[in-house]
């Protein structure tokens, strides 16, 4: 477990918010106590107010003793107080002498008095020049020029490719990552190396500020595909009743999807082979798909409706859907404007827009009875594949 004692940055790019984001991304249990209140945004610090130790102590002493303590913007004597409270905990102190905009937080001479109480002191190369050389310093070179970033600890020099750009909150993110890996029993050298690799991944996804939360998008991508692969056998089980001649797809969009390549689906579709449904491939974000484009279009109006499946048209399916309370829209392809018919993929967009305009709410089912060169089709919409599957079962089972 890691105890974070750090300042509050209202912009969320640095400080205790960033610390908790990084540690959460690592799956490390975290307790947090605010040590300083700042007035700042991503570009400038206006003021800082350090909290009284006695107030902080009352909050800290009721918590579980931590394995690692990460100290951010705090009165320097806080490090000594924490060492007295937790003699067996590793303390990682991210020294912040001044902001990138030039706001002075701490006096270097005052900081020097308390360096010995931390196991590791993380600071940038400019700050290290002001404080001198200490055996427990981990010095970052992000402020220096070059195509790589170097981090120095004792006789070790770690190097990693630089991510272009200026980012608010890199010091907090890096020191929190080091703390997290130490809490997982990494040797300090490996904690530094792993923290550098993690920060690089975060910065590659960030713009202007350290956006650790975007790592969650990687989990969403995994979860979306995993959800599709797990539920596939259930779709195959009823596939003999649902798969149309053109094949079937289960398209499940990421929450922020803007195009079909941000929608999970089954490339090659689900097909019928000797009367039995089979999937050509496992779930992927690759390949193009009409149902994927339909999912993206639906989300423009109803962002929570992220899943759509095409189903073989049977008149009794439509009647059961209506009878069992699903919201059904009949799409008449003969009424499509010429410009819609002539533009590839535009029919799907226009279809959904017409359904929403008439129903005034998200449709469960949109069906059409076919047209020249177009197979009659039912499309079923829902929040996720499980919900769509249940709607399909309502339609196909007597």
Curated annotation (Swiss-Prot):
Region spans: Hydroxymethylpyrimidine/phosphomethylpyrimidine kinase: 1-216
Note down the stretches annotated as region Thiamine-phosphate synthase. Answer: 217-398
Reactions listed under catalytic activity: 4-amino-5-hydroxymethyl-2-methylpyrimidine + ATP = 4-amino-2-methyl-5-(phosphooxymethyl)pyrimidine + ADP + H(+); 4-amino-2-methyl-5-(phosphooxymethyl)pyrimidine + ATP = 4-amino-2-methyl-5-(diphosphooxymethyl)pyrimidine + ADP; 2-[(2R,5Z)-2-carboxy-4-methylthiazol-5(2H)-ylidene]ethyl phosphate + 4-amino-2-methyl-5-(diphosphooxymethyl)pyrimidine + 2 H(+) = thiamine phosphate + CO2 + diphosphate; 2-(2-carboxy-4-methylthiazol-5-yl)ethyl phosphate + 4-amino-2-methyl-5-(diphosphooxymethyl)pyrimidine + 2 H(+) = thiamine phosphate + CO2 + diphosphate
UniProt cross-references to Pfam families, sorted A to Z: Phos_pyr_kin (PF08543), ThiN (PF10120)
Q: Which GO terms describe its molecular function?
A: ATP binding; hydroxymethylpyrimidine kinase activity; phosphomethylpyrimidine kinase activity; thiamine-phosphate diphosphorylase activity
| Biological process per Gene Ontology, one example term | thiamine biosynthetic process
Sorted keywords for this record are: ATP-binding, Kinase, Multifunctional enzyme, Nucleotide-binding, Thiamine biosynthesis, Transferase
Coiled-coil intervals: none
UniProt key word Cytoplasm: no
The pathway to which it is assigned is: Cofactor biosynthesis; thiamine diphosphate biosynthesis; 4-amino-2-methyl-5-diphosphomethylpyrimidine from 5-amino-1-(5-phospho-D-ribosyl)imidazole; Cofactor biosynthesis; thiamine diphosphate biosynthesis; thiamine phosphate from 4-amino-2-methyl-5-diphosphomethylpyrimidine and 4-methyl-5-(2-phosphoethyl)-thiazole: step 1/1
Q: Which domain of life is it from?
A: Bacteria
Which residues hold 4-amino-5-hydroxymethyl-2-methylpyrimidine? 40
Q: What EC number(s) does the entry state?
A: 2.7.1.49, 2.7.4.7, 2.5.1.3
Q: Which residues cross the membrane?
A: none
EC class name: transferase
What does UniProt give as GO cellular component?
cytosol
Into which family does the record put it? In the N-terminal section; belongs to the ThiD family.
The free-text function statement in the UniProt record for this protein reads:
Catalyzes the phosphorylation of hydroxymethylpyrimidine phosphate (HMP-P) to HMP-PP, and of HMP to HMP-P.
Q: What is this protein called?
A: Bifunctional thiamine biosynthesis protein ThiDN
State the species of origin: Thermotoga maritima (strain ATCC 43589 / DSM 3109 / JCM 10099 / NBRC 100826 / MSB8)
């Amino acid at each position: 477990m890691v105890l974070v004692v750090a300042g509050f940055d209202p912009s969320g790019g640095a400080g205790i918010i960033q610390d908790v984001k990084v540690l959460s991304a690592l799956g490390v249990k975290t307790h947090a106590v605010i040590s300083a209140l700042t007035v700042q945004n991503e570009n400038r610090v206006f003021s800082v107010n350090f909290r009284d130790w006695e107030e902080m102590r009352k909050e800290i002493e009721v918590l579980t003793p931590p394995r690692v303590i990460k100290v951010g913007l705090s009165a320097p004597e806080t490090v000594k107080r924490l060492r007295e409270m937790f003699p067996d905990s590793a303390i990682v102190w991210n020294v912040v002498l001044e902001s990138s905009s030039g706001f002075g937080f701490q006096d270097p001479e005052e900081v020097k008095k308390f360096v010995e109480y931390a196991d590791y002191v993380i600071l940038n190369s400019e700050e290290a020049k002001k404080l001198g050389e200490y055996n427990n310093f981990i010095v970052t070179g992000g402020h220096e020029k070059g195509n790589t970033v170097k981090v120095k600890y004792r006789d070790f020099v770690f190097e990693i490719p630089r991510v272009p750009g200026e980012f608010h909150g890199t010091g907090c993110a890096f020191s929190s990552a080091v703390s997290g890996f130490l809490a997982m029993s990494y040797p300090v050298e490996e904690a530094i190396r792993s923290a550098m690799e993690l920060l690089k991944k975060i910065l590659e996804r960030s713009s202007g500020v350290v956006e650790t939360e975007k790592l969650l998008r990687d989990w969403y991508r995994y979860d979306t595909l995993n959800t599709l692969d797990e539920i596939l056998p259930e779709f195959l089980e009823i596939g003999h009743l649902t798969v149309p001649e053109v094949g079937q797809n289960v398209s499940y969009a990421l929450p922020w999807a803007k195009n079909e390549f941000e929608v999970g689906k089954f490339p090659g579709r689900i097909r019928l082979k000797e009367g039995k449904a089979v999937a050509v491939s496992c779930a992927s974000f690759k390949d193009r798909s009409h149902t994927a484009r339909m999912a993206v279009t639906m989300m423009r109006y109803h962002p929570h409706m992220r899943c759509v499946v095409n189903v073989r048209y049977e008149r009794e399916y439509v009647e059961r859907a209506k009878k069992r309370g699903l919201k059904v829209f009949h799409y008449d392809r003969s009424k499509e404007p010429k410009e819609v018919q002539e533009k590839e993929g535009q029919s799907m967009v226009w279809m959904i827009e017409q359904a929403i305009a008439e129903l005034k709410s998200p449709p469960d089912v949109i069906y059409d009875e076919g047209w020249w060169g177009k197979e009659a089709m039912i499309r079923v919409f829902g929040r996720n594949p499980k919900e769509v599957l249940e709607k399909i079962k309502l339609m196909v089972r007597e």
